[in-house]
UniProtKB/Swiss-Prot annotation:
GO molecular function list: argininosuccinate lyase activity
Lineage, highest ranks first: Bacteria, Pseudomonadati, Campylobacterota, Epsilonproteobacteria, Campylobacterales
Gene (UniProt): argH
Annotated protein name in UniProt: Argininosuccinate lyase
EC number(s) on file: 4.3.2.1
Organism: Helicobacter hepaticus (strain ATCC 51449 / 3B1)
Domain of life: Bacteria
């Protein structure tokens, strides 16, 4: 098959080159963006006098027919087409004749692919934001029910201070809030139109790039043509943001694995989102959270792969950047799947408050409250209070009990500076609610945090709905 670029070549491409060079079997995912960009380009060519109104409409009608064929699965993609741009242009010319050959006037595949890929990433950005907001809403719905469910807060995976389960879930939601904010920042920074940049230096046709920008829903055109065709920062931004999402998902998954273990028993995963063992009949394995952890490495790899592709490229287009898409496609697919299944896993899990409370009674979680009591009520310097509290802990351990189980008389017997009323501060409920500063684990503070995050979710959901018309 003759190549659209084959005029100066005497020999046909080898079959091996066609196999090696073709990107059509993965960049065909960009077909909607390619057709959208071509329609806008055709309208712009009419505006600057290259196409007549009749020719413009003929091209647009032809592109719509091709779009219908692709969406119905009737369009055949061939390696000889090289990429989605050539496949659609060849099909258009075969469909409407020589008029189709005019479409590529004042356009290069360099700015064409920069447009298509950017449009795809921006569209995907909105989809991932939507999934994050849905996940946050599910987390917050659970958190609202458990603002008084006491559990052990941990540092170094050791019992530290009592918190409520809702507070722990709010911490998860805060991570995903930052992910949303990061993606929104990416969108604003990258919502610029590269079409009209040509191969690397602009075009001599007087392309109306402002018209293209408005037609395609961008905020503004890119500034420099050479940068426009060589820039893949938007793809790297997406991969970095996806990597951060997966890091946060992986940390949540780690807690789900721990909390569902026999040693914790804080939660039970639904049978719908757990698996069994091929040899041990009693097993119920947390495969979903384990796979969520594992997939984070895959997404990190896609980010590092594209960074390595881009690091040594001279400016303007290089064929190396054909390697930019598969990693992004794969990462988007996997992160989307991870967000959806994590949401369902959380919605269907069973929560065991009694086990959380039982474990909160182990490990002297109210020790800090004893030290604070010594400072506030007994006038003891904090370092001395720390030492005295350590002595009380040692005494409790010698008795085989938690410090909250000691009598007031026993506690006061450890050091003469300990005053009456100390027993009351060792209650887990008191300890949790004593942390009533902004950001603390007290019930009132946890409820406030939930309200703030729910408001954020509502606002961003509304903005997402309003913004769906842009770049779509």
């Amino acid at each position: 098959m003759a190549k659209l670029w084959g005029g100066r070549f005497e020999l046909d491409s080898s079959a091996l080159l066609e196999e090696f060079n073709a990107s059509i079997f993965f960049d065909k995912q960009l077909w909607q963006e390619d057709i959208k960009g071509s329609k806008a380009h055709a309208k712009m060519l009419h505006k600057i006098g290259v196409l007549s109104e009749e020719e413009t409409q003929e091209i647009i009608n032809g592109l719509e027919i091709i779009a219908q064929r692709i969406s119905r699965g009737e369009f055949v993609f061939n390696a000889s087409d090289e990429d989605i741009h050539m496949a659609i242009e060849s099909a258009l010319t075969a469909l409407i004749g020589d008029v189709g050959k005019k479409l590529h006037t004042a356009r290069s595949r360099n700015d064409q692919v920069a447009l298509d890929f950017r449009l795809y990433v921006l569209k995907s950005n909105k989809e991932i934001v939507n999934l994050l907001l849905e996940l946050m809403a599910s987390i917050l719905a659970i958190a609202k029910v458990h603002t008084s469910t006491i559990m052990p807060g941990m540092t170094h995976l050791q019992h530290a201070q009592p918190i409520n389960f809702g507070f722990a879930l709010v911490a998860w939601a805060c991570n995903f809030k930052r992910d949303v904010e990061r993606l929104l920042s990416d969108y604003t920074r990258n919502n610029k139109c590269p079409l009209g940049s040509g191969a690397l230096a602009g075009t001599p046709y007087g392309n109306d790039r402002i018209f293209l920008t408005q037609e395609l829903g961008f905020d503004e055109p890119t500034l420099n043509a050479m940068d426009s065709v060589s820039d893949r920062d938007f793809a790297l931004d997406m991969l970095y943001s996806l990597s951060m999402i997966m890091m946060h998902i992986s940390r949540v998954a780690e807690e789900l694995v721990l909390w569902s273990s026999s040693e914790f028993k804080f939660i039970s995963l639904s049978d719908e989102y757990a698996t069994g063992s091929s040899i041990m009949p009693q097993k119920k394995n947390p495969d979903v959270p384990e796979l969520l952890r594992g997939k984070s490495g895959r997404v990190y790899g896609e980010l590092m792969g594209l960074l390595c592709v881009m690091k040594g490229l001279p400016f303007a287009y290089n064929k190396d950047t054909q390697e930019d898409k598969e990693g992004v496609f794969d990462a988007l697919k996997n992160v989307g799947l991870c967000l959806r299944i994590l949401k369902e896993c959380l919605k269907t899990m069973s929560i065991h408050p009694e086990n959380m409370y039982k474990m909160a009674k182990i490990g002297h979680l109210s020790a800090t409250d004893l030290a604070d009591f010594l400072v506030r009520e007994c006038g003891v310097a904090f370092r001395d209070a720390h030492h005295i509290t350590g002595q009380v802990v040692a005494y409790a351990e010698s008795k085989g009990v938690d410090i909250s189980d000691l009598s007031e008389k026993e506690i006061m017997g450890v050091d003469s500076r300990i005053k009456q009323g100390v027993k009351a501060v060792l209650c887990l409920e008191y300890s949790m609610n004593a942390r009533n500063t902004l950001g603390g684990t007290a019930v009132t503070q946890t409820c406030h945090q939930i309200e703030v995050l729910e408001s954020f979710v509502r606002e961003q959901m509304a903005c997402l709905q309003v913004g769906r018309s842009k770049n779509e």
